[in-house]
């Protein structure tokens, strides 16, 4: 009887594993295929893309889009500017999020509820990401034992020292989550630069790519009356569009695997437990 139960249990477990594996495989395909499609479309003839001939493999391979993108002298400066803005913005933003989240996790903080309401109001006018603050606060409240804070207080440790010596070393997962969230936000931000920056030499990469795409579209419109000119210009515009997506996405795709372990752990600890 017991052996039959074990056989049934093993059979049900195998069935679950097969179904679960199939579901995860489908999910991976749904997430990864759009990225793959953009990559192969960026090196394929646009007419082949429109005809649906690049479903799995590139067709009539061409690198004209990448040549046009990297031909611009502003690309290198755009990359450096984006890296500078992303690193500086991430460091400042994550530092503010961590300190604010740590303070808000203290139930003894005077006017704690009123301050939280104030922060929620600021969601509508920018500043520190309140969502990130809430996730960080939840992490500090639920993932680090309060006894550690109490022991540090008994030993004479102040709030700042407790935060630096105890809370931060144990907060690597949530730090990774905040770094990824903030880096992606700063890396993809072009509208802020469009509003405030006058010098093109200071444009971030996303704005540089936008300018290149707009110029190529304008060129296609100007060549509309020329025989075959519009078709060729429009073809180049499509290549530039796909190439720009790849060029702008590669740095974040490279960075993510290095923090994936901390990202998953921190996101679950900071969100689900709360």
Segments predicted by a language model, with ranges:
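A hydrophobic, multi-pass inner-membrane permease signature
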Residues: 2-274
